[in-house]
């Protein structure tokens, strides 16, 4: 609208004179910074932001698991927070969550999926602190569990490990050593420490786990609309920006299209 008004009021096109002659008035610019709505979608187009490759993701999670064993083997209490962080990173990935969505999860946010009984009590996840648009409250969404190993990982944390945390009596899924919820700075620093220890690209951030979730679902053949709804995007274009398909995925996609085209061309009874 702003650009249209710029065009309409540009003296080079004489629209102002024509409107004044026909209607007795002339167009003016009506869209300014102070009355324009801010773009509320994620600005994720920066080229340095990307998803993990599958190999990078495996290396990151393997290191997180090994860190738990290393700390516990030394007889230190820090193995509980280490296991919490390892599980938290996995949950952030398997549900495609943002950082704050992850840290604000409660024990009661998991539920059953009637169409996915094999997941038991962990068939769905209620995200209560989704990204809020300007002037609005947090947007909620319910995410479906996709991978079969997810329930076991969560159940182990909730039933066997979390009760040993000092602040485990609260509702938060991820209590810290000092309070009912782990802090943002702690998550960022732990993630960076693991990433650097494995020797991964510094461009990978905690949010890259969400990007990886989107990318891997698309690569595995899930419907783009399903993926969009899982991660709470209003627009398919935002989901597309998040998708960082590998060269192998693009090659396979092209091969599939070419094979289908050739098969259709050779189908008996086809007329040119």
Protein language model features and the residues they cover:
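Non-catalytic DNA-binding core/recognition domains of DNA-processing enzymes
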Residues: 1-22, 81, 146
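Short, charged phosphate-coordinating catalytic segments
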Residues: 10-19, 92-121, 225
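Conserved tyrosine-mediated DNA breakage-rejoining catalytic core shared by Y-recombinases
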Residues: 24-30, 104-153
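C-terminal catalytic core of Y-nucleophile DNA break-rejoin enzymes
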Residues: 46, 133-155, 169-191
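Basic, Lys/Arg- and aromatic-enriched nucleic-acid-binding interface segment
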Residues: 59-99
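Short, basic (Lys/Arg/His-rich) helix/loop patches that form interaction surfaces
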Residues: 71-75, 188-229, 233
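Catalytic-site neighborhood detector that most strongly recognizes the C-terminal catalytic loop/helix
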Residues: 231-257
């Amino acid at each position: 609208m702003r650009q249209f008004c710029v065009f309409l009021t540009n003296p080079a096109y004489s629209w102002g004179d024509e409107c004044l002659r026909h209607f007795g008035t002339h167009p003016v610019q009506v869209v300014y910074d102070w009355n324009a709505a801010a773009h509320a979608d994620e600005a994720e187009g920066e080229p340095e932001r990307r998803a993990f490759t599958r190999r990078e993701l495996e290396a990151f999670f393997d290191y997180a698991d090994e860190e738990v064993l290393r700390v516990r083997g030394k007889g230190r209490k820090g193995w509980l927070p280490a296991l919490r962080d390892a599980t938290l990173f996995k949950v952030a990935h398997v549900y495609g969550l943002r950082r704050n969505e992850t840290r604000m999860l409660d024990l009661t946010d998991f539920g059953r999926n009637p169409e996915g009984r094999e997941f038991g009590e962990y068939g769905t996840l209620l995200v209560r602190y989704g990204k809020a648009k300007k002037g609005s409250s947090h947007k909620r969404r319910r995410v479906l569990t996709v991978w079969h190993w997810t329930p076991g990982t969560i159940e182990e944390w909730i039933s066997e490990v979390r009760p040993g945390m000092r602040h485990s009596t609260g509702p938060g899924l991820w209590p810290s050593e000092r309070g009912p919820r782990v802090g943002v700075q702690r998550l960022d620093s732990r993630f960076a420490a693991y990433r650097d220890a494995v020797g991964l690209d510094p461009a990978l951030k905690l949010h890259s786990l969400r990007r990886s979730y989107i990318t891997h679902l698309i690569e595995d053949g899930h419907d783009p609309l399903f993926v969009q709804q899982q991660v709470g995007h209003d627009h398919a274009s935002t989901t597309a920006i998040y998708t960082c398909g590998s060269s192998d995925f693009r090659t396979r996609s092209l091969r599939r299209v070419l094979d289908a085209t050739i098969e259709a061309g050779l189908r008996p009874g086809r007329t040119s």
